Amino acid sequence: VEHTPPERDRVLECYRDGVRAIRALADRVTAWDAPTPCGEWQAIELAGHLRCVAENYLEYLQDAPDSRLAKLFAWEGAAAVLIRRQARQNAAELAVLPAEPGPGRITAFTVSAGAYADLIPDQWDRTHLVYRGTKYTVGDHAGAACVEWHLHAWDLARTIGEDYRPRDAEVLVPAWHWGVPHLPLVRGEPWEAVLRSSGRSPRRPEGPAAR
């Protein structure tokens, strides 16, 4: 099935919305040892993951199309193995992250995520990686970043007993198809489809989820 790439302006606005949502929700976290929907992670670890991912995105952009991520996706194995390798990378990076309060990690995330947003417009059509013979651009990966930020905004919301829905959930569908090509997107209402495809349950306030 052919999927039309999402509109650039919508992706950029959705990206910024996700960063703002994470910052706003993190400001309301009072217990950083609270459990999250992300498996065994507490809120402090989710904040650390956000910092690591935002810093990685800057690295991947700088090194594209020969980044660590591009080399990982160039491997032609099963998607499940790719997912496990990414999970191991997440765990390893979190393990060596310096100890710091949750708000400090969120501030570092915001700085890196903002720098990424400033850089990507001028590199939108540059090749970011190749997966199973298809070239994916910096703009495509910006869509993946949108998905990442809004999913983790939802995680933070559930951690503090709230719900969350992106302002423009519809753009996350093509963003997923072009930014997360190794994972299928289930059918359904756009935001619920994204939640379910990531391993989250829209109906439950807590439970294990993909990262």
Regions found by a protein language model. Name each.
Residues 1-14, 18-24, 28-42, 59-80, ...:
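Structured surface interface patches that mediate subunit assembly and partner/cofactor docking
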Residues 49-50:
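Glycine-rich loop at the start of a catalytic domain that most often binds anionic cofactors/ligands
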Residues 80-95:
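A basic- and aromatic-enriched beta-loop-alpha substructure that forms the phosphate/nucleotide-
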